[in-house]
């Protein structure tokens, strides 16, 4: 079987996702699709709009054959760890031939070239990176500047204003990290990319005659009439959303506030909360009335909105240094969220070709700190979304789609 892997959040599943899935099947000419999907918390450092089982149903309705969960520790991390967790999981299955992801540039050769430079770290590139970091630039910006200078020195034929745009676009950044992970793992999986169409990844406004971003759809659902989002989602996705409940960001703020006020040292356990940002959060926690307000009071050139969101999410989930160290290795298990008949065949192939632990039922799973953390994350999510109960991970079986 020719199997394609895709890495998603489906938060929620919209027309852009439907196009990506269809195009991924066409461009790779595959026999089946495995989707690695974030669970109940996502890469922005927020609870998913709706739970992972509802989003699994959306994926299966759309034509994904097998949905597996990206462990929460990777799912709530920066692009580098998010990508490594997802790619290493797909690689460990030993059945995936291709990976297909969206990008703003749609240029797989450029993405691969940039990935090679970053992973190989030529001495001159390292020197430039060091210099830009000394200037106080945040790491992503310093790396972008170092890449541009290195390519310029090596007479790489490219418009540098275009390259700067490439290096500062959300999906391109993830695409580079996916390819970087493939190089790091010496994987035989072949990467493909599809140019992202429609609204920008971070665009929060719905616009007629355009594919909307998930951000805009979530904002519409949270702030106005849900029916506004109908034109931007497949009907099956909309109907599933209509019959479920959504996570409550105000409750998340209350829980984060409680965690920090009751134990200010909780921030010291999170390596990302360094350089005085922990003190800034503590100073502003009493002034803010919402998560958004707290982040806007604390953000700076070095600490972006999303980076702060992830730090606060890790406070909520009580992440510590020992847990974060697990991100350096591939997950030892694959958690099955749902499958169809073809997905059942793919599972048989995984069992034949891979030694990875396949988790269908948690009651039979081997002990694993990443899996235990997922269970805890779902239990915390149950305080934010009334459709999820404590211990839902034990109570809900993989979804079988016929």
UniProtKB/Swiss-Prot annotation:
Keyword Lipid biosynthesis applies: no
HAMAP family: TmcAL
One Gene Ontology term of the molecular function aspect: tRNA binding
Entry-linked InterPro entries: Rossmann-like_a/b/a_fold, tRNA(Met)_cyd_acetate_ligase
Catalytic activity: cytidine(34) in elongator tRNA(Met) + acetate + ATP = N(4)-acetylcytidine(34) in elongator tRNA(Met) + AMP + diphosphate
Enzyme Commission number(s) of this protein: 6.3.4.-
Tree of life domain: Bacteria
Gene Ontology terms: biological process: tRNA modification
Keyword entries, A-Z: ATP-binding, Cytoplasm, Ligase, Nucleotide-binding, RNA-binding, tRNA processing, tRNA-binding
Origin species: Clostridium perfringens (strain 13 / Type A)
SUPFAM superfamilies: Nucleotidylyl transferase
Protein name: tRNA(Met) cytidine acetate ligase
Family as reported in the entry's similarity comment: Belongs to the TmcAL family.
Record GO cellular component, one term: cytoplasm
Keyword Ligase: yes
Residues that hold ATP according to the record: 7-20, 102, 171, 196
Protein purpose: Catalyzes the formation of N(4)-acetylcytidine (ac(4)C) at the wobble position of elongator tRNA(Met), using acetate and ATP as substrates. First activates an acetate ion to form acetyladenylate (Ac-AMP) and then transfers the acetyl group to tRNA to form ac(4)C34.
Enzyme class: ligase
Localization, UniProt: Cytoplasm
């Amino acid at each position: 079987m020719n199997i394609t892997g895709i890495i998603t959040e489906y938060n929620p599943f919209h027309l852009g996702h439907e196009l990506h899935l269809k195009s991924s099947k066409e461009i790779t000419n595959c026999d089946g699709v495995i989707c690695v999907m974030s669970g109940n918390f996502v890469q922005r450092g927020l609870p998913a709009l709706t739970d992972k089982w509802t989003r699994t149903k959306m994926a299966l309705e759309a034509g994904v054959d097998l949905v597996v969960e990206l462990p929460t520790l990777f799912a709530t991390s920066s692009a580098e760890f998010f990508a490594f967790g997802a790619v290493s999981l797909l690689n460990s299955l030993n059945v995936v031939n291709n990976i297909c992801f969206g990008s703003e540039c749609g240029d797989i050769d450029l993405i691969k070239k940039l990935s090679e430079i970053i992973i190989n770290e030529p001495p001159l590139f390292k020197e430039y990176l060091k210099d830009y970091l000394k200037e106080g630039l945040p790491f992503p910006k310093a790396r972008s500047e170092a890449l541009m200078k290195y390519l310029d020195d090596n007479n790489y034929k490219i418009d540098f204003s275009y390259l700067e745009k490439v290096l500062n676009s959300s999906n391109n950044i993830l695409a580079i990290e996916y390819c970087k992970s493939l190089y790091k793992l010496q994987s035989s999986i072949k990467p493909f990319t599809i140019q992202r169409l429609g609204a920008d990844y971070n665009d929060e406004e719905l616009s007629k005659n355009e594919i909307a971003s998930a951000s805009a759809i979530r904002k519409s659902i949270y702030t106005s009439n849900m029916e506004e989002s109908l034109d931007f989602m497949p009907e099956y996705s909309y109907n599933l959303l209509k019959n479920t409940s959504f996570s409550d960001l105000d409750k998340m703020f209350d829980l984060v506030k409680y965690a920090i006020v009751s134990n200010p040292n909780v921030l010291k356990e999170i390596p990302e909360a360094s350089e005085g940002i922990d003190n800034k959060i503590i100073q502003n926690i009493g002034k803010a009335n919402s998560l958004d307000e707290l982040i806007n009071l604390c953000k700076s050139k070095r600490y972006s909105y999303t980076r702060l969101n992830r730090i606060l999410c890790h406070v909520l989930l009580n992440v510590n240094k020992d847990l974060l160290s697990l991100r350096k290795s591939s997950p030892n298990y694959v958690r099955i969220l749902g499958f169809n008949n073809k997905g059942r065949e793919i599972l048989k192939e995984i069992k034949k070709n891979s030694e990875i632990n396949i988790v269908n039922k948690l009651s039979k799973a081997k002990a694993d700190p990443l899996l235990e953390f997922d269970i805890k994350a779902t239990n915390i999510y149950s305080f934010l979304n009334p459709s999820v109960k404590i211990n839902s991970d034990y109570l809900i079986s993989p979804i079988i789609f016929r």
